[in-house]
Amino acid sequence: MHILTDYASDIKGMISYFDRIIVKGYNRQLCNSKQFGYFLGAQKILYKDYPTYAQEKTEELCKHIENIAAEQNRPSMFLRSSKVSKEETALKLLNESPVDSGLVCLISTVELCTAMGLEKNHKNGQLYVGSQNRKCKFYYLYFIDEEFGWMHFKIQTWFPFMVQIYINGREYLSKMLDKEHIGYTRYDNTFTHIDDIKRAQELTVKIESEKLSRIFDAMARKINCHCELIRNILGHEYYWCLSECEYATDIMFTTRQSLEAIYPSLVEHAFFSFSCEDIMSFFGRKVSGKGSQSFQGDIASDLRKRHKGIRIKHRMKSNQVKMYDKVSVLRIETTINDPHDFKIWKDTITKDGYHKKAWTPMGKSIANMYRYAQVSLAINMRYLNHLSVIYDKVTPIKMIERMSSTIETDNRKYSGFNILKEETIRLFEILSNGSFIIKGFTNMDIRKRLYTHEDITSAKVRNRTTRLIRKLIAHELVWKTPKSMRYHITVKGRKVIGHILYFIKKEYPEAFAFIQ
């Protein structure tokens, strides 16, 4: 069974592409103490004069960047605290001073950095320039770019002038769709509808890392006025690497209700059923025999309720895959922070000096962006396929037949559930509430939601609810937590209730309207 085929009538389609992309740029020569010394020597700058020289270059850079904003008549703002959201500040400035494209605003603040500073060798008393952890001024330039849409360019104002570029993959994809004249509907950074999904997915296959490098180089030259000087002396500019990369697979449902009918079951299954071995298999780790015992690292699952829905995340070391719902979209998203856990087929040099192709640990170079996409998509699809194991349409029918009939447990008879009765449907909707997945529910939780027009503190209502819970336990829909007054829905209960609610919502929406 597979979600995409079993619920095809409720699904518009699926699209996979990058979500958040953070690219860092740095000059490797400027980060090396000896080569930095060569850089200064080529300009006849003595080590003792470096602080003055560095201050001059910083002032030149700051003046140049501020002139860019002034020439384009765009707003600038200095944030006294680096903890203030630059994104929200930029959006506020955009709202106050609208622009369709180009530079939106310039934001500056003081943050921690790694800069090149003057140091003294205590053994021989000689001066040299080495990397230091300190604070310096950073500039954030926000753009509405023709190629990438909403993005920002961050630059450090002290040597070695490291930069960071943030791109929203969904913004990037929307620009591709605009060029192809493909219609779409977006909510935030999520596509809820795309007119031509097949063509849209074709656009995402070709990843031109060389083109991206050229675009980033052009941006850097425009913003960093020292690029030409650095290139003339050292022969290199910025080296671009992927600091953080999110790749998301979005399954677009026709309605929010269609997604809600199955999502609680998906979350519960993922949280309670996925083992460490399962999570390792998502990330492409072969688990057999003593395979899991040789793994060095930590694996964890985390469930969190957000204002937009429920998010579940599985982490292996620093890489992670998560699932969450957003409007009518089910998103499975992989974040690669450490690519060395994955392999890439590339040219290598043997000990004998020969060149040959081999699978080697993947690095962070932007040239490997295509491989990031391949690995992330494979993880997303393994996760989706594993979720599909719970969807069996035959077994729930037999379960529903049994729960609709009278049963006898411990010499006591319990009547069946009338699945079309209003009170039963209300009860099932309450039980399917995602907030009960972790902590479970109590007698009072059911009373407050089920008997809204009655005195829930009365013994009559309390006893009636107790009998109802016992009935749920007898039908194996609920289990009681030992030594507590809390209850949890069983996997069987989640499966049966999910199918009943899905059927009623889909086939008899007017009959279901009373609990909306």
Residue ranges and their predicted role:
Residues E401-G440:
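Short alpha-helical segments that sit at the start of domains
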Residues L141-I397:
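Extended, non-transmembrane interaction/recognition domains
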Residues I456-A474:
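Short amphipathic alpha-helical interaction segments
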Residues I437-T452, I456:
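Short acidic, hydrophobic short linear motifs in intrinsically disordered regions
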Residues M485, V491-Q516:
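Short, amphipathic alpha-helical interaction segments positioned at domain boundaries
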Residues Y451, R470, A474, G498:
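Residue-level detection of the helix-turn-helix DNA-binding "recognition helix"
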Residues M1-Q257:
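Long, contiguous, compositionally biased segments that the model treats as domain-scale units
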